[in-house]
Amino acid sequence: MDECGSRIRRRVSLPKRNRPSLGCIFGAPTAAELVPGDEGKEEEEMVAENRRRKTAGVLPVEVQPLLLSDSPECLVLGGGDTNPDLLRHMPTDRGVGDQPNDSEVDMFGDYDSFTENSFIAQVDDLEQKYMQLPEHKKHATDFATENLCSESIKNKLSITTIGNLTELQTDKHTENQSGYEGVTIEPGADLLYDVPSSQAIYFENLQNSSNDLGDHSMKERDWKSSSHNTVNEELPHNCIEQPQQNDESSSKVRTSSDMNRRKSIKDHLKNAMTGNAKAQTPIFSRSKQLKDTLLSEEINVAKKTVESSSNDLGPFYSLPSKVRDLYAQFKGIEKLYEWQHTCLTLNSVQERKNLIYSLPTSGGKTLVAEILMLQELLCCRKDVLMILPYVAIVQEKISGLSSFGIELGFFVEEYAGSKGRFPPTKRREKKSLYIATIEKGHSLVNSLIETGRIDSLGLVVVDELHMIGEGSRGATLEMTLAKILYTSKTTQIIGMSATLNNVEDLQKFLQAEYYTSQFRPVELKEYLKINDTIYEVDSKAENGMTFSRLLNYKYSDTLKKMDPDHLVALVTEVIPNYSCLVFCPSKKNCENVAEMICKFLSKEYLKHKEKEKCEVIKNLKNIGNGNLCPVLKRTIPFGVAYHHSGLTSDERKLLEEAYSTGVLCLFTCTSTLAAGVNLPARRVILRAPYVAKEFLKRNQYKQMIGRAGRAGIDTIGESILILQEKDKQQVLELITKPLENCYSHLVQEFTKGIQTLFLSLIGLKIATNLDDIYHFMNGTFFGVQQKVLLKEKSLWEITVESLRYLTEKGLLQKDTIYKSEEEVQYNFHITKLGRASFKGTIDLAYCDILYRDLKKGLEGLVLESLLHLIYLTTPYDLVSQCNPDWMIYFRQFSQLSPAEQNVAAILGVSESFIGKKASGQAIGKKVDKNVVNRLYLSFVLYTLLKETNIWTVSEKFNMPRGYIQNLLTGTASFSSCVLHFCEELEEFWVYRALLVELTKKLTYCVKAELIPLMEVTGVLEGRAKQLYSAGYKSLMHLANANPEVLVRTIDHLSRRQAKQIVSSAKMLLHEKAEALQEEVEELLRLPSDFPGAVASSTDKA
């Protein structure tokens, strides 16, 4: 190889020599070799000519382009004489200026194929002529294995590329020599310096093969030329046959492989020409070389651009097949429904248009959204925001998608409650899926707009889109979507819901297409129960229902008094083998119904999964530090439990897990379960057509009955609405009328709606004058519906009035930009207080009160305890719901330390005032009721942080534990808002560090050692205690845990839950590691405005 390499290097510098034509290789026979009377010569030449003509019509083989010199005279790259017979096949009607791009020149030009071209035909003719010589027929079949592989021939051959031909030649002094066996030709020292590098390597292969003919095994050799890599070649079998032992065996071999041996010559030449095509050809023009290099780079860049812009990564809706496998592995989904396939292949989806789709509950809407999100994350390489209505659903979705993030390489980030970073971490490699509540989603979008990163958000998915018409939360959702539509032309919006009616308004607002289907994986049958008769809902019937059956359950007089609605009869038809939900009007009614049903169930129900139900009770006691709700203690042994907001988060999660696994078979619940986590049932019973004291709405009814029927488990779903005769007409209207229309609440929710919107528009500089703000409002959902919603005032008047209010409140200032006799135009800019309010997402009704409280707190902030800080972060909107127990208030007040009593004194609440209220005495001095009530709630929170036992605090203050849980969650969220509020005001610098720690304490409200475990989504206090006791004391422990070991170690932990916990821990660990790594790289990166960098670039220029 070294020798070959040196020859290749030599040939570049040595002068080129003239070489003879093709015939000299196999040489026409000399005078001594010719046989007189060879009459077939002319006929054979005609046959060869016909063979050359037959090659027309075969498509040329695609090969790598050959670089040519600047002038047509340089077509012969190797130098030397050109055979005119070969050049006549080359195109000559093209001038220099008409030449195609060099990168597209086919080295074989007009020839149809290098497997059967005229050059090969010439070689074939010469071989046939040689074989027809009588004295050479004996050795004809030996030609390929002996002469072609001999050292002398190897050294005599050289290959010259001529335009799009390849000519095989010999030196002039061997022109009249023939390739007889036994004739020795002494090789010259420099016979290969004109051979291209790949050919030199090729003949080196031949030499080595001929030396190894006696070996019994075949050898493969990989060669690399000095200029490029060549493909691994395996030498033809004909060149490495074993030596012939005797004449007989030799004869047999020759006879059986005549055709193979003849073809081997072609094979050798084909390989040689292919190698020559890949060999780097010397370039004599430096400008031409530079041009070709630039062209090659442009082609490579274009290829990479095409590859990177391709959104098709695989066969599963442009996603890798691994995604399909993960759905089968994690969720048991083997195949999509027909409607899901249709929806995913809609033109509007393919063209990235906005889309609204609506299907009944349990129809599989979420799966379509997830596939679209994965397409955006993996194919389009952009971030995704998913907006969900409740914290519990956010956490459920985080747990479900973390496994996909680990496997497919993207982050899943939680934005709910007090969790979420603003602005979000900017990832350079992996993309992020933000899963957020409505409020946190709005803050996230504001943050992205402010930092100029809104276009990094490729897709926004909104679940339960109908909530856009529900109060202040609907107004917040509308603001979020309107800002995205106005500021980003590349962000796609997907909205889904089971209950939509006036879709046209939403389509106009979102500029979206609409897709709907009535598909349900399980058939749903609706029934009405009046007295002991059950009717089936039938839209074709005259009165909307038809008789179905009579209840045949035997009721005693006692049972009839206790259960006038026949609930026991209805549930015992289903449980315990199937699940059942009973929706009740109020929380108290849920508990009463659960206890009543258990009183009349037979003892046989106690035996059904008895061991598992004992485990549930045991775990509930562990969660409550030995405390257990007496109602649950009586109902769980029968497989029955209540489900409402009075449960703590840990209790609710544990009961939901038990229901999902079939340990519990009956839930008595409020309407909030219908819109919360997915807990379907075989039968759904509506205890009454009321939610609290309000009559049921069509949307609420559809959501409740939509829980009936579990895909993959039940073959049918049933809903039964129990009603009294007096409600019959209203119920018939309820089941037949269309869904309620969805209306904007942007103006109705004044301080949480339109004013908050205007403040953020000006603060984010989306619109800063009256005309721009009015134009923005016309594009909102309210703008679409203004003709219906506005009766007394116009949109312009409302806009002017709102801006005036914000200016008077000190949140905005206006600057005159144009003034004339007829009109004055203003530009608005946000004040420091206004910026703090919109950055902290503070309700504008309370922003000035909050500012005053924080300002007053600076005058005498008491830091000996957390009580003063807790008071400052207790939500204002919960104060009006508080009705203190004055005796408890007085008892707690009297137990305060002097420093804590000092906090009350600073706030203006004295012990004497509380004592008089407790004893019922008249109060002479007027005290602010809101301050008194807020301090009472602060006592509750302060006690909870000290004791961390919600049951103990519940007993001390005589409050439902669920209320205390909600108070804690709301305070943690508001504390986060106050922190962002203070970050915008320099005067409140002291609160920043203090509120960070307080927010963390309020969020977890556990001992410090449990906080790292509770950072993992789905791990609440009870589970954190179990994990800590089992030795899992850090995030790293959980991230590296084995799910199977967790199942065996932790009580009442399913395999699915264990996998989700481990996946969530891994995701959180990766996020933290990635953030630290990016921070390090950012610190080490040279600043773009570094003076030395500018000087360096100037010097290079």
Curated annotation (Swiss-Prot):
Cellular component (GO) terms are:
nucleus; site of DNA damage
SUPFAM superfamilies assigned: P-loop containing nucleoside triphosphate hydrolases, Sec63 N-terminal domain-like, Winged helix' DNA-binding domain
Documented activity regulation? ATPase activity is strongly stimulated by single-stranded DNA. Presence of ATP and Mg cofactor are required for helicase activity allowing to unwind duplex oligonucleotides up to 60-70-mer. This helicase activity is stimulated by replication protein A (RPA/RP-A) complex that binds to unwound regions and inhibits re-annealing.
Q: Which organism is it from?
A: Homo sapiens (Human)
Protein name in the entry: Helicase POLQ-like
Binding residues for ATP, per the UniProt record?
Answer: 359-366
Alphabetical list of Gene3D superfamilies matching this protein: 1.10.3380.20, 5' to 3' exonuclease, C-terminal subdomain, P-loop containing nucleotide triphosphate hydrolases
UniProt biased composition (Basic and acidic residues): 213-225
A Pfam family: HTH_61
**Where is the Helicase ATP-binding domain positioned along the sequence?**
346-518
Q: What is its EC number?
A: 5.6.2.4
Name the gene: HELQ
Cite the record's note on assembly: Homodimer. Interacts with POLN. Interacts with RAD51B and RAD51C; promoting association with the BCDX2 complex. Interacts with the replication protein A (RPA/RP-A) complex. Interacts with RAD51; stimulating HELQ DNA helicase activity and ability to unwing DNA.
Q: In which residues does the motif DEAH box occur?
A: 463-466
Q: Name one GO biological process term.
A: positive regulation of double-strand break repair via homologous recombination
Primary location recorded for the protein, binned into one broad class:
nucleus
Q: Which domain of life is it from?
A: Eukaryota
Which SMART domains does its entry note? DEXDc, HELICc
**Stated consequence of mutating residue 463 to A:** Abolished ATPase and DNA helicase activity
UniProt family annotation: Belongs to the helicase family. SKI2 subfamily.
